[in-house]
């Protein structure tokens, strides 16, 4: 039994492999309890603030449903509902909310903002996504891998394919080295992963038995992999020039049925944190088709809808793992 009461959840860098496994075991147990109607509420009477400087579907729903299941109350502060860094500093916001709430979730921009909230709030602070990291997503990913593979995480071969400089590449690499995985980032040289973070992760890998490979060679990068993972190539609000250059560089790295076959593993799975641009059924999808002539971006529609895809199991597990984080750090023991 681990006592994680009152701990912040800012990055998996702050947790040991045993503590990460504890979160995953707790999430598994909470999921089972929800399905069997035997869930015990450990957050009764708690008040939780959800700060969203960036819009969200999965993260917001996961925190709201998870909190409700556990008996907590939430207040949602959307992009127009909080004044962090505009009318009020992160430190002042933290000290105000910390007087009223038992826990605070933050989804937004720089990692330094969530770190400042944690420093000043006096209550547990949880990172729902920053520009540099996305630790709650990684717990969901690892729970999903556990459910689909009959082997421990330290025997998993995992390739993240696409934009090697984004927060998912960072977050997955941190989680993978903590858990002893064979982890590869397969990305064009022109989009490098943070060198200091790679160096730090390689240090951790030396202790845990993990492997870290950064390559632009798709065939080498995905060979023998259990999991191929990707994320969107560009974020909303980025200028057209960025879209054009990223699309040109990353189109060869689209994850498709051919790439799954390149793993040589008939049991390989495809994962994606969502939302995914895999068809023209959204306003963004239509815009991409009109501007760039692409009907799919980071993943082919065929693969997304195939038996290899476990993206909706992964999405559901956001809720169970986020619930586990709240219960472990805030719940009555």
From Swiss-Prot:
Keywords attached to this entry: Arginine metabolism, Cytoplasm, Transferase
Subcellular location: Cytoplasm
Binding residue positions for carbamoyl phosphate: 56-59, 107, 134-137, 273-274, 318
Keyword Nucleotidyltransferase applies: no
EC number, UniProt record: 2.1.3.3
Gene Ontology molecular function terms on file: amino acid binding; ornithine carbamoyltransferase activity
Cited InterPro entries: Asp/Orn_carbamoyltranf_P-bd, Asp/Orn_carbamoylTrfase, Asp/Orn_carbamoylTrfase_sf, Asp_carbamoyltransf_Asp/Orn-bd, Orn/put_carbamltrans, OTCase_ArgI
Organism: Clostridium botulinum (strain Hall / ATCC 3502 / NCTC 13319 / Type A)
Main localization (coarse): cytoplasm
GO cellular component terms, A-Z: cytoplasm
Family according to the record: Belongs to the aspartate/ornithine carbamoyltransferase superfamily. OTCase family.
GO biological process: arginine biosynthetic process via ornithine; arginine catabolic process to ornithine; citrulline biosynthetic process
Enzyme class: transferase
Superkingdom of source: Bacteria
UniProt function note: Reversibly catalyzes the transfer of the carbamoyl group from carbamoyl phosphate (CP) to the N(epsilon) atom of ornithine (ORN) to produce L-citrulline.
Catalytic activity, reaction form: carbamoyl phosphate + L-ornithine = L-citrulline + phosphate + H(+)
Chain sites annotated for binding L-ornithine: 167, 231, 235-236
Pathway named in the protein's UniProt entry: Amino-acid degradation; L-arginine degradation via ADI pathway; carbamoyl phosphate from L-arginine: step 2/2
Name the record gives this protein: Ornithine carbamoyltransferase
């Amino acid at each position: 039994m681990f006592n994680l009461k009152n701990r912040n959840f800012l990055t998996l860098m702050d947790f040991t492999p045993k503590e990460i496994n504890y979160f995953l075991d707790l999430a598994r147990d909470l999921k089972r309890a929800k399905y069997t109607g035997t869930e015990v509420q450990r957050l009764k009477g708690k008040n939780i603030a959800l700060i969203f400087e960036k819009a969200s579907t999965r993260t917001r729903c996961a925190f709201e449903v998870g909190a409700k299941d556990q008996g907590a109350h939430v207040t949602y502060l959307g992009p127009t509902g909080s004044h962090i860094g505009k009318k009020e500093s992160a430190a002042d916001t933290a000290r105000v909310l910390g007087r009223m709430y038992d826990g605070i979730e933050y989804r937004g921009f720089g990692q330094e903002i969530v770190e400042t909230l944690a420093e000043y709030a006096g209550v547990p602070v949880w990172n729902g996504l920053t520009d540099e990291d996305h630790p709650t997503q990684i717990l969901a990913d690892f729970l999903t891998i556990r459910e689909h593979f009959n082997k421990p995480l330290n025997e998993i071969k995992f390739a993240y394919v696409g934009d090697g400089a984004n927060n998912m590449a960072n977050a997955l690499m941190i989680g993978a080295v903590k858990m002893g995985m064979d982890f590869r980032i397969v990305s064009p040289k022109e989009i490098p992963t943070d060198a200091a973070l790679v160096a730090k992760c390689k240090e951790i890998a030396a202790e845990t038995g993990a492997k870290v490979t950064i390559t632009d060679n798709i065939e080498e990068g995905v060979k023998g992999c259990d999991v191929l993972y990707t994320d969107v190539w560009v974020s909303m609000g980025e200028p057209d020039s960025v879209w054009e250059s990223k699309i040109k560089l990353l189109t060869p790295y689209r994850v498709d049925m051919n790439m799954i076959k390149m793993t040589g593993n008939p049991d390989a799975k495809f994962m994606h944190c969502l939302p995914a641009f895999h068809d023209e059924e959204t306003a963004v999808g239509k815009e991409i088709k009109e501007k760039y002539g692409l009907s799919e971006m980071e993943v082919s529609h065929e693969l997304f809808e195939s038996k290899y895809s476990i993206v909706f199991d992964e999405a559901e597990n956001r809720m169970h793992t986020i619930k586990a984080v709240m219960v472990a750090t805030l719940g009555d023991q």
